[in-house]
Amino acid sequence: MCEHNLLNSGYVGSLLNFTSPEPFYFANLRPNGTQLATLSPALSYTRRDVCSLPWTSSPCASPPQSRAFSGYSQSYLSNSVSISINRHVSDKAAAGEEPNKYYFQDSSRKVEERCRHNQSYPSDASIPSSVNINPAKYEYPNVETSLHGSSLHNQGFELNSNSPTVNDGIKQSVSLSMSLQSSVTPVCNRSSDGLPWCPTQVRSRRKRKPYTKQQIAELENEFLANEFINRQKRKELSDRLNLSDQQVKIWFQNRRMKKKRLVMREQTLSLF
């Protein structure tokens, strides 16, 4: 026969008629240091006396619930996930299940569910070719963005070319882009025609109209009389010689410059 240690958790639990040690840890040991006098008047141990000595496993046969918690020397367990004070957990512990294993299995089950949920939505680059893509869910703007080098095309996303809806969308987008380009840039085959709907890019130079001998003679006589003419005299010459006012003005300017060059040449020749 082995001695029953009063500090053994299994012995205390058997005296108090507890099926699991959770009520002894949490329900009866209060933070203010109250005793177990309400449930068992024979026990006069305080919280300090109980917590000062380490709990060791007894060689006696103890219930599986007390054997699972016989190695702990703490009065309070900080891990609230593995051990719960719920009544439902204590009922399962009485049936022979360990609550810490149950909660760890539950947490691992939640992790597996999260992994499955994340795998159900793969990235664009990891979409296998066997995935059936419903073409009715995708509109033509998605196809256009993929044609213009969108992120789906950069990440290696390949459209199913066998689907007729996608092929029709590609053809329509290509034809639309070609029609827009043709409307923006009009075609002009001949630039020298000078047509109103296709103006020439380079402005053609006006053909020079030479002066007649009669016009030159009249202008020379007027220049010998007066090198500088006013507006009224210029108007009379233009009307008489059938010339524009601008032509008369330019001819007088050129004639003055010609006379100046002749004078400078005579001066240079006289020096030598």
From Swiss-Prot:
Subcellular location(s) of the protein? Nucleus
GO CC, sorted alphabetically, is: nucleus
A Pfam entry, by short name = Homeodomain
CDD domains, A to Z: homeodomain
Q: Which GO terms describe its molecular function?
A: DNA-binding transcription factor activity, RNA polymerase II-specific; sequence-specific double-stranded DNA binding
Gene3D superfamilies attached to this UniProt entry: Homeodomain-like
Give the record's family classification.
Belongs to the Abd-B homeobox family.
* Name listed for the protein in its UniProt record: Homeobox protein Hox-D12
Species of origin reads Heterodontus francisci (Horn shark)
Biological classification of the source: Eukaryota, Metazoa, Chordata, Craniata, Vertebrata
